[in-house]
Each structure stands twice: as structure tokens, then as C-alpha cells.
Design a protein with these regions (language model features):
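Phosphate-handling DNA/RNA-contact segment within nucleic-acid enzymes
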Residues: 1-76, 80, 93-94
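Active-site-proximal structural scaffolding
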Residues: 20, 42, 66, 90, ...
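Generic, well-ordered alpha-helical scaffold segments in large soluble proteins
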Residues: 27-30, 43, 76-79, 97-104, ...
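Acidic, metal-coordinating catalytic cores used for nucleic-acid/nucleotide bond scission
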Residues: 44, 65, 85-94, 114-120
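Flexible glycine/proline-rich, aromatic-decorated loop/lid segments
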Residues: 70-73, 99-101, 140-144
């Protein structure tokens, strides 16, 4: 019952996981057509999504996202939407990917799985429960910086001086790393 859905292929000399994107050859035309790519964690998430005609979905093939992944995707669209699992590992992976997105010069946004669908922990589970909620979730991503701010507001008690100070310190570090001066100015004024 606690077995994984699948076991990831290990990295080898012939198979470089940091450069390969699962499902990209099947998704690239749809990514161009829709104007955005959806990146998920698992291969099953990609397969389930393609089976319900949401075909602009790819996966990082069981490895952490890299700048190489983002640069490869940016050949088809600069709008990249992340939908990693809703567990702590997925949240951590999303946070790491946001800084990589800034390095790669892509526009990242975050898809949060609609929790009204019986606590689906990944896209595959959500698709099995409610295909329309999956489509709706993809259509309503949250800008990456806003997602990060929301995460830290949940973790820190911003009703206290220490919580506000910690949040401000984290937020300023994130904003300082932004490349776009308009975006940087917007968040500084927030």
C-alpha cells in the first residue's frame, strides 16, 4: 500500500536526467499552441494529463529541476507553470525551481492543486477525481513571487514583530534577486 507509483530510472553515462524532459517530444507542439508549458514531478502525471487531452504537460523525469530543463522548455514558450506534488518535498522543489527560473530568464508561475478534490496530492490523483478541476487549476496559476510570499506567510507568525522581521528579510532577499526592474519595483512597493 505504501509502494511508490513508479521507480525512477537512475542517472547513467547514457541517460542524463538533468537534461531530459519526459514527454517533451509529445508536448512541444501543444506548448507552442497554448503558449505555456506545465511541468509536473511524475511521469504518471504526464501520462494521465495527455490521456485527458491536456497535452502541454511534461515532467522532470524524477530528478530536481535544472536550468537546462528550463532553457530547453523556453525554446517552445517562456511561460512555464510548475505543478509539483503538494507534499513538503514538492513545496521545497518549487521553491528551488523559482530561483532557477530567474537564472534561466523564464516566466514562472505556480499551479496549486485544488484541495476541494479530496486532497489530491499530485496531478494524476486530481485527474482521476476531477478532470475539470485539473483544467481549471492549469488556467489559474499564481505568479511565483506571490506563491512564495504566501508560503512564508503560512510558516511565519506575521502578527509578531519577529515574524514580520523574518518575513521582510526573506521577501527582500527574494525581490533583490529579480531580474526585471518593473517586477522588482512592484514587489518592493508591496
Amino acid at each position: 500500500p505504501n509502494a511508490p507509483k513508479y521507480l525512477n530510472t537512475p542517472q547513467t553515462l547514457l541517460y542524463d536526467k538533468s537534461s531530459n524532459i519526459f514527454g517533451l517530444s509529445q508536448a512541444k507542439n501543444e506548448i507552442r499552441k497554448t503558449g505555456f508549458a506545465v511541468v509536473v514531478e511524475g511521469n504518471m502525471d504526464v501520462i494521465s494529463s495527455h490521456q485527458v487531452d491536456v497535452r502541454n504537460v511534461v515532467a522532470t523525469a524524477g530528478t530536481a529541476m535544472t536550468v537546462n530543463h528550463l532553457k530547453a522548455l523556453s525554446r517552445f514558450s517562456n511561460d512555464i507553470r510548475l505543478c509539483f506534488d503538494s507534499d513538503q518535498a514538492g513545496i521545497n522543489a518549487t521553491e528551488r525551481a523559482i530561483s532557477l527560473g530567474q537564472q534561466a530568464g523564464v516566466e514562472l508561475s505556480i499551479i496549486t492543486l485544488d484541495q476541494s478534490a479530496g486532497q489530491a496530492k499530485d496531478p494524476d490523483e486530481l485527474i482521476q477525481k476531477d478532470i475539470e478541476l485539473w483544467r481549471k487549476s492549469i488556467s489559474n496559476p499564481q505568479p511565483a513571487m506571490e506563491w512564495v510570499f504566501d508560503q512564508y506567510q503560512k510558516r511565519l507568525d506575521i502578527s509578531t514583530a519577529k515574524g514580520k522581521k523574518d518575513f521582510s528579510t526573506i521577501a527582500l532577499k527574494l525581490v533583490e534577486n529579480l531580474n526585471d526592474p518593473v517586477e522588482k519595483d512592484f514587489y518592493i512597493n508591496e
